[in-house]
Regions:
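Glycine-biased, small-residue-rich flexible motifs in mid-sequence functional cores and linkers
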Residues: 1-6, 80, 86-385
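Short, small/acidic-rich helices and loops at N termini and domain boundaries
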Residues: 1-93, 372-381, 385
Length: 385
């Protein structure tokens, strides 16, 4: 077994070690600079870091438990797929910005492009119950930032997150190193919410999906603050689009401040309760943003010219309108869906039964129409907006 394989085995054993203190191990790694350097420290030093006896034993070369070895074997089997990656703290693919944080994870599970994972990232987060204003701006901001060479990082949640991912995916084109990164609050072998299965796959195929949680981990509420910390840790800054006063997005913004990241906030209508968190952030010193160029300027990137009509989405209009009132850049499938919805409201299964397209194609087409504000979905029933 090579030294790299031994290092990976040790990392997996430490990761799955029962009774271990993950924050203590992360801080020790941050202080020592590598797992290899941590292995060379004395037991006394390891104890001062707060490492458990079982962690100290593993670092001293003692064998891992049968349970830890079995879980490590499961990870290695998962990583046999060429698109699956186990990225340890010592790996050359471990994101440098994340390595610089106070509590970097020992291990990342990654699906997709390692180049995307290591690219310049800007986090876009916000309400799961976003208004049309929030969804449209999330899509527009993400699309324009991605076109300028910025990878968009978000959390795969409903609302703002999903629309940010879609905007980046639609802008990425042929540049495989710039797209979007989805950070999960579950194991990477689970999709949460389940409705985003098609979006998850599209991100894995064209960007990167990342998790610090073990395979099989369910969507427990206490996982999501850790996910939010990872989102901000991967990014140079965090843009908050619609957030209530008590919102997980504000937790992400707080982590960003602690990690010395820039915080940006999109203002909203005063009557919109989902925008109050953004207004509070602006009061506290977050940069008010109403144009992607505001962020590009702060990042030292070349500002993009004002969006041309028909070139991309904007908060107020989606391309050149033709006589039907539809954007002229709709796909044929989307036109068929709108044509049917003009005659009757439909459930998703109705479109499937009509054999118009595959599940994934329908899901993406309808989600894109929702983002554009052309259809709405309530209780699973689609209608013309």
């Amino acid at each position: 077994m090579s030294s790299d394989d031994l290092q990976l085995r040790l990392a997996l054993s430490l990761f799955h070690c029962k009774g271990g203190h993950a924050p203590a191990l992360s801080r020790a790694l941050r202080h020592q600079g590598s797992l290899k350097a941590l292995m060379a420290t004395t037991r006394e030093a390891q104890e001062q870091y707060g490492l458990s006896l079982s962690q100290q034993a593993l670092l001293s070369g003692e064998p891992a438990s049968a349970e830890s070895l079995a879980l490590g074997d499961k990870d290695l089997e998962w990583a046999l797929d060429s698109e699956h990656h186990l990225v340890t703290y010592d790996s050359i693919f471990y994101p440098e910005r994340l390595r610089e944080t106070d509590c970097p994870p020992l291990l990342l599970y990654v699906r997709g492009s390692l180049a995307t994972l290591g690219s310049l990232q800007l986090a876009i987060v916000g309400s799961r119950n976003a208004s049309d204003y929030g969804k449209r701006n999330a899509y527009w901001m993400a699309r324009e930032l991605c076109k300028a060479g910025v990878t968009v990082c978000s959390g795969l949640a409903l609302g703002v997150d999903a629309n940010a991912h879609l905007g980046a995916l639609d802008a990425a084109g042929s540049d495989a190193s710039v797209s979007t990164v989805a950070v999960l609050g579950t194991g990477i072998d689970r999709v949460y919410p389940a409705a985003h299965r098609a979006l998850f796959q599209r991100i894995a195929d064209n960007g990167a999906v990342v998790s610090e949680f073990p395979l099989g981990m369910r969507a427990y509420a206490y996982n999501f603050p850790r996910r939010n910390r990872l989102i901000s840790g991967l990014s140079v800054g965090v843009l908050v689009i619609e957030a209530a006063i008590k919102s997980g997005s504000l937790i992400t913004a707080r982590y960003a401040v602690e990690q010395n990241r820039e915080v940006y906030a999109l203002p909203s209508l005063l009557s919109n309760p989902q925008g109050r968190g953004c207004h509070e952030l602006i009061k506290q010193g977050a940069m008010l943003v109403d144009d992607p160029n505001d962020i590009l300027f702060e990042l030292g990137l070349k500002a993009r010219e004002a969006t041309e009509a028909g070139d991309t989405l904007s908060p107020t209009g989606f391309g050149n309108l033709i006589d039907t009132g539809e954007p002229n850049d709709l796909q044929p499938l989307q036109r068929k869906l709108l044509q049917r919805l003009r005659t009757e409201d439909c459930l998703f299964d109705s479109f499937l039964d009509a054999d118009l397209a595959s599940f994934g194609a329908l899901n993406h087409a309808l989600l894109d129409l929702e983002v554009r504000g052309l259809v709405s979905c309530r209780g699973g029933r689609y209608t013309i907006a």
